[in-house]
């Protein structure tokens, strides 16, 4: 288990030595991983760090506004790149190809920002489970196996690459980051793209965005899951009034875990599941069916793609 009081000074020293007098940019998503990296890097190199938030169009409801507010003190640069990401994902259905398309677009946008800032280094919040899943061939992560092989940075610096998620949270508390960051539920780097099975379209993203908002609103505070979300699986037959309808199938996922390496589905009360179904199908008219995924990890991963 990590000892934050020892890890923090060593991480700051390592960042200082790797970047020296150079400038660095960081992919700041607002998650605990990137937030911890940003704070460590800021303590190491100060104003030579430029945090950048990319609005990919694949984020949760209200995400960009929330991140802009929380990190306004760090001179956060917000880059709007929704059209580029959707163009890169057009026609792509294979999960690995989707992740790699997102990874390549992600790094190219950052390269462009780095050139403007004359930054030579990219800081990333890769954690140990990301590397294990990528190296083991389970699935690539946008900041590991999904990155292009040729990049315009001297080096990628990964300060927390040997930590598990619960250890990152301990470091976040020790750094005195806001509670909202320390307790923030994991959200995948590729965003809602991996919660939309098959090709990513604006319609499917909007359904996923609204469904995720409902699921988080209903389950986070009451059940404290390690992770919970909604995914759009495809289309199925339903009934709206007395008319046959063909609408989206939404799957709800809620799991408990210590570090993300293994996970068990939460045994949610039946009345809670019924309430979720009612809210999702009534508030999102394009949804025809709601299911609850009870599969543990393994054999499944937590996310659907």
Curated annotation (Swiss-Prot):
Pfam families from the entry?
GMP_synt_C
Q: Which CDD domains match?
A: GMP_synthase_C
- Which UniProt key words apply to this protein? ATP-binding, GMP biosynthesis, Ligase, Nucleotide-binding, Purine biosynthesis
Report a single Gene Ontology molecular function: ATP binding
Q: Where does the signal sequence lie?
A: none
Pathway, according to UniProt? Purine metabolism; GMP biosynthesis; GMP from XMP (L-Gln route): step 1/1
Which terms in the GO cellular component ontology are assigned? cytosol
Question: Reaction catalysed?
Answer: XMP + L-glutamine + ATP + H2O = GMP + L-glutamate + AMP + diphosphate + 2 H(+)
Q: What is its EC number?
A: 6.3.5.2
Q: Enzyme group, top EC level?
A: ligase
Ranges of residues in domain GMPS ATP-PPase: 2-184
Q: Which residues hold ATP? A: 29-35
Q: How does it assemble?
A: Heterodimer composed of a glutamine amidotransferase subunit (A) and a GMP-binding subunit (B).
The free-text function statement in the UniProt record for this protein reads: Catalyzes the synthesis of GMP from XMP.
List the protein's name. GMP synthase [glutamine-hydrolyzing] subunit B
**Organism from which the protein derives:** Methanosarcina mazei (strain ATCC BAA-159 / DSM 3647 / Goe1 / Go1 / JCM 11833 / OCM 88) (Methanosarcina frisia)
């Amino acid at each position: 288990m990590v000892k934050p009081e020892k890890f923090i000074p060593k991480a700051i020293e390592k960042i200082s030595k790797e970047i020296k007098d150079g400038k660095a940019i960081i992919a700041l998503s607002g998650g605990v991983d990137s937030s911890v990296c940003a704070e460590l890097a800021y303590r190491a190199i100060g104003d030579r760090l430029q945090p950048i938030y990319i609005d990919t169009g694949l984020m949760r409801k209200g995400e960009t506004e929330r991140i802009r507010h929380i990190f306004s003190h760090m001179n956060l640069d917000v880059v709007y790149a929704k059209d580029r990401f959707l163009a890169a994902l057009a026609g792509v259905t294979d999960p690995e190809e989707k992740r790699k398309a997102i990874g390549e677009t992600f790094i190219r946008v950052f390269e462009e920002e780095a050139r403007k800032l004359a930054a030579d280094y990219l800081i990333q919040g890769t954690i140990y489970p990301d590397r294990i899943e990528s190296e083991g061939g389970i699935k690539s992560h946008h900041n590991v196996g999904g990155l292009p092989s040729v990049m315009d940075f001297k080096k990628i610096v990964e300060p927390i690459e040997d930590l598990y998620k619960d250890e990152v949270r301990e470091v976040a508390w020790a750094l005195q980051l806001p509670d909202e960051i320390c307790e923030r539920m994991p959200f995948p780097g590729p965003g809602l793209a991996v919660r939309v099975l098959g090709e990513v379209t604006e319609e499917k993203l909007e359904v996923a965005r609204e469904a995720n908002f409902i699921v988080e609103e209903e389950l986070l505070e009451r059940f404290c899951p390690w992770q919970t979300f909604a995914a759009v699986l495809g289309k199925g037959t339903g009934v709206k009034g007395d008319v046959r309808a063909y609408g989206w199938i939404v799957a709800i996922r809620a799991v408990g875990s210590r570090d993300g390496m293994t996970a068990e589905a939460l045994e949610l009360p039946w009345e809670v599941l019924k309430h979720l179904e009612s809210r999702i199908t009534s508030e999102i008219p394009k949804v025809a069916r709601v299911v609850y995924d009870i599969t543990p990890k393994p054999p499944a991963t937590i996310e659907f793609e």
